[in-house]
Regions:
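Signature of the catalytic double-stranded beta-helix
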Residues: 1-12
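Short gly/pro-enriched beta-turn/loop segments at secondary-structure junctions
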Residues: 7-9, 18, 38
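Beta-rich nucleic-acid/ligand-interaction surfaces
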Residues: 11, 15-23
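Catalytic core of Fe(II)/2-oxoglutarate
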Residues: 20, 30-39, 49-161
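Histidine-centered divalent metal-coordination motifs
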Residues: 26
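Eukaryotic charged/polar low-complexity linker/IDR segments
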Residues: 42-44
Length: 161
């Protein structure tokens, strides 16, 4: 396939999460809102020198039915994780990070794009989901449902056409 790295780093680039921060499990956007290309691969490079196990921040990869975590990646310095971005690539670091205030979980994210496939679901925003062990939270469920609208972000971007 003809993959290209996202030239504008839409949603990518440098990510920095401080103590107490987290990233709930989600599916990434599938269609780039400016280029109209489909996101196919995520490359995450961890930049955490002297990261300790007790800080947490592991990247979790979940199965397509969101019933179990199938892999984790410790955010060790210079570790790279490459995974397909598709209709079932649920991932995140959902547990609050427990690092000192002067430390942060750092990573560089690069997304690779290609011509959109007809069979792919069209998501213009990340779709956040609840893990089986997450407590019921009606307010958070309402927010997840609101964000899940497939066209909720498209209205914020100008078309190149």
């Amino acid at each position: 396939q003809d993959l290209i790295a996202d030239p504008g780093f839409h949603g990518g680039g440098m990510h920095c999460t401080k103590s107490g921060g987290k990233l709930d499990i989600h599916l990434d956007y599938s269609i780039h809102p400016k280029l109209g290309l489909e996101r196919r691969l995520n490359l995450i490079l961890f930049l955490n020198k002297d990261w300790k196990d007790e800080y947490g921040g592991n990247l979790e990869l979940w199965d397509k039915d969101m019933t179990k975590c199938v892999a984790t990646a410790y955010p060790k310095f210079n570790r790279a994780v490459l995974f397909e971005t598709g209709d079932y690539s649920y991932h995140g670091h959902p547990e609050p990070i427990k690092c000192p205030e002067n430390v942060a979980r750092k990573s560089l994210a690069v997304y690779y794009l290609a011509k959109a496939r007809e069979t792919s679901e069209k998501r213009y925003k990340a779709r956040f989901v609840k893990r089986p062990q997450d407590p019921d939270d009606p307010e958070l469920d309402k927010l997840r449902k609101l964000r899940a609208g497939l066209n909720t972000a498209k209205q914020f971007y100008k078309s190149n056409n």
